[in-house]
């Protein structure tokens, strides 16, 4: 189960055009987004370490998204 709250994902699905959203669908989307975000975060951390920094900066996230 995702650590992120499910309600924002229900809103995202409705904003995308869904009239109704099952809890399971919102939970599944939350899990998928969390997995993707974790991979981006891991890459950003590695980029910060490579730059000899302990702080992850916006540019690390941007670079991670490009990879």
UniProtKB/Swiss-Prot annotation:
One of its GO terms (molecular function) is protein heterodimerization activity. One of its GO terms (cellular component) is chromosome. The keyword Iron-sulfur does not apply. Transmembrane segments: none annotated. Keywords: Chromosome, Cytoplasm, DNA-binding. This is Probable archaeal histone 2. The record marks 14 as: Interaction with DNA. Residues 20-22, 54-57 are annotated as: Interaction with DNA. Homodimer or heterodimer with another histone. Dimers then assemble into higher oligomers, with the DNA wrapped around the protein core. Belongs to the archaeal histone HMF family. Signal peptide: none annotated. InterPro entries: Archaeal_histone_HMF (IPR050947), CBFA_NFYB_domain (IPR003958), Histone-fold (IPR009072), HmfB-like (IPR050004), TAF_TATA-bd_Histone-like_dom (IPR004823). It comes from Methanocaldococcus jannaschii (strain ATCC 43067 / DSM 2661 / JAL-1 / JCM 10045 / NBRC 100440) (Methanococcus jannaschii). Binds and compact DNA (95 to 150 base pairs) to form nucleosome-like structures that contain positive DNA supercoils. Increases the resistance of DNA to thermal denaturation (in vitro). PANTHER family: ARCHAEAL HISTONE A (PTHR47828:SF1). It is found in: Cytoplasm; Chromosome. The keyword Cytoplasm applies. The lineage of its organism: Archaea, Methanobacteriati, Methanobacteriota, Methanomada group, Methanococci.
């Amino acid at each position: 189960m995702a650590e992120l709250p499910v309600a924002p994902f229900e809103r995202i699905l409705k904003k995308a055009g869904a009239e109704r959203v099952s809890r399971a669908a919102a939970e599944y989307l939350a899990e998928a987004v969390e997995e993707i975000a974790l991979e981006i975060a891991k890459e950003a951390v590695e980029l910060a370490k490579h730059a000899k920094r302990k702080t992850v900066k916006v540019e690390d996230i941007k670079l991670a998204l490009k990879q």
